[in-house]
């Protein structure tokens, strides 16, 4: 428990203190966000706002987790779990892709950043590496960080993704991992369109996963098989990482709240999407994350609907997509959209955790 709080506190302090350093540096160098002319007209005044603030989020998450691990080594003698390192690696790797994209846009002056093919290849390589490694490193109970079984609040034994033999099964599993990672990283990226929206929603999702992974730690099958126990490797490390993500997002939100002094850029949004995906995979709650992260899902689905309907009929379903711009163009103030989406995100997170806890109560009542 102590390590979880320390991870969040250190991450918050690191992000809240390092972000203004980035604001000054990027402002001095003129590395400001370009605003698309076809976007909401109210956003044109944001042109030139420093971006790549996701660097501060990554610093916060990394420092928060490492300090918490060191505290565990000193006070409890317990070393870090491999699951935490793998998810942190995924987060940093996708953050690196986002940084390259931001850097090319801002420093090299190429408006579109990395081309779609290069970005896709980078994400593909990272996801494959992550997918392969999470099936390695079994602990003393033969539990690996990942599982080939599809999961809701825990593994579903009747839904094995890796069917059809070792080779075909591995290919199917890696395709699934690629879909999960790509979906969440792009979903957070789409959500990052209003001041404080993506950082606030991600903080709420991370808060839910602090509770979920801590409960898995308290009821781990590694401590002895019992009714309702969870076959999750290193749940305490996952809780520490979720707490670090929560703290880093809140620290960044201090400066990213309207009117934003800095944007996270693709550096932050792709990294946070990786963190969301990694936590859902290693905690064996991929389908539950769809509920907990419902705002991210809503934003993505709105874009899919808009693009599909427009290509089919030449007409639009929404005034503008993602859907937060639909409400903004409908007369809602930007802060109103953000706060209401935060409230919906909190409702989704509570619903998801309620389902998670309710299943545990059911599993332990027989």
Curated annotation (Swiss-Prot):
Q: Which family does it belong to?
A: Belongs to the glycosyltransferase 4 family. MraY subfamily.
Membrane topology, as annotated, equals: Multi-pass membrane protein
The protein here is known as Phospho-N-acetylmuramoyl-pentapeptide-transferase
Q: Which HAMAP family does the annotation name? A: MraY
Instruction: Write down the chemical reaction(s) this protein catalyses.
Output: UDP-N-acetyl-alpha-D-muramoyl-L-alanyl-gamma-D-glutamyl-meso-2,6-diaminopimeloyl-D-alanyl-D-alanine + di-trans,octa-cis-undecaprenyl phosphate = di-trans,octa-cis-undecaprenyl diphospho-N-acetyl-alpha-D-muramoyl-L-alanyl-D-glutamyl-meso-2,6-diaminopimeloyl-D-alanyl-D-alanine + UMP
Does the UniProt entry include the keyword Cell division? yes
User: For this protein, what is the EC number?
Assistant: 2.7.8.13
Q: Does the keyword ATP-binding apply?
A: no
Cellular compartment(s):
Cell membrane
Instruction: List the GO molecular function terms.
Output: metal ion binding; phospho-N-acetylmuramoyl-pentapeptide-transferase activity; UDP-N-acetylmuramoyl-L-alanyl-D-glutamyl-meso-2,6-diaminopimelyl-D-alanyl-D-alanine:undecaprenyl-phosphate transferase activity
What pathway, per the record? Answer: Cell wall biogenesis; peptidoglycan biosynthesis
Q: Where is it mostly found? A: membrane
Q: Name one GO cellular component term.
A: plasma membrane
Q: What class of enzyme is it?
A: transferase
Protein's organism? Corynebacterium urealyticum (strain ATCC 43042 / DSM 7109)
Summarizing the function annotation, the protein's role is: Catalyzes the initial step of the lipid cycle reactions in the biosynthesis of the cell wall peptidoglycan: transfers peptidoglycan precursor phospho-MurNAc-pentapeptide from UDP-MurNAc-pentapeptide onto the lipid carrier undecaprenyl phosphate, yielding undecaprenyl-pyrophosphoryl-MurNAc-pentapeptide, known as lipid I.
Q: Which GO terms describe its biological process?
A: cell division; cell wall organization; peptidoglycan biosynthetic process; regulation of cell shape
Q: Which cofactors does the annotated protein need, by name?
A: Mg(2+)
């Amino acid at each position: 428990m102590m390590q979880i709080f320390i991870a969040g506190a250190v991450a918050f302090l690191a992000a809240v203190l390092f972000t203004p350093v980035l604001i000054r540096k990027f402002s001095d160098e003129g590395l400001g966000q370009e605003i698309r002319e076809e976007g909401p007209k109210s956003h044109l005044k944001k042109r030139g706002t420093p971006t790549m603030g996701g660097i501060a989020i990554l610093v916060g998450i990394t420092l928060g987790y490492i300090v918490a691990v060191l505290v565990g080594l000193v006070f409890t003698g317990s070393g870090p779990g491999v699951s935490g390192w793998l998810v942190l690696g995924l987060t940093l790797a996708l953050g690196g892709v986002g940084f390259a994209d931001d850097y090319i846009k801002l420093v090299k002056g190429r408006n579109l950043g990395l081309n779609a093919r290069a970005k896709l290849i980078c994400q593909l390589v990272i996801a494959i590496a992550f997918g392969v490694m999470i099936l390695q490193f079994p602990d003393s109970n033969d539990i690996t960080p990942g599982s080939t079984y599809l999961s809701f609040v825990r593994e579903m034994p009747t839904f094995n993704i890796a069917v059809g033999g070792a080779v075909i099964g591995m290919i199917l599993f890696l395709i699934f991992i690629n879909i999960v990672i790509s979906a969440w990283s792009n979903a957070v990226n789409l959500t990052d369109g209003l001041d404080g929206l993506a950082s606030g929603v991600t903080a709420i999702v991370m808060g839910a996963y602090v509770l979920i992974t801590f409960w898995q730690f308290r009821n781990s099958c590694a401590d002895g098989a019992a009714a309702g126990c969870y076959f999750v490797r290193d749940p305490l490390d996952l809780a520490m990482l979720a707490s670090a993500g929560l703290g880093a997002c809140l620290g960044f939100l201090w400066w990213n709240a309207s009117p934003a002094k800095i944007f996270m850029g693709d550096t932050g949004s792709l990294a946070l999407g990786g963190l969301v995906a990694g936590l859902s995979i290693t905690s064996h709650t991929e389908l539950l994350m769809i509920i907990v992260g419902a705002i991210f899902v809503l934003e993505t689905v709105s874009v899919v609907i808009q693009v599909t309907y427009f290509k089919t009929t030449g007409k639009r379903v929404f005034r503008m997509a993602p859907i937060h711009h639909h409400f903004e163009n409908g007369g809602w103030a930007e802060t109103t959209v953000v706060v209401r989406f935060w409230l919906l995100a909190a409702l989704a997170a509570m619903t998801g955790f309620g389902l998670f806890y309710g299943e545990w109560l059911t599993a332990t009542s027989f």
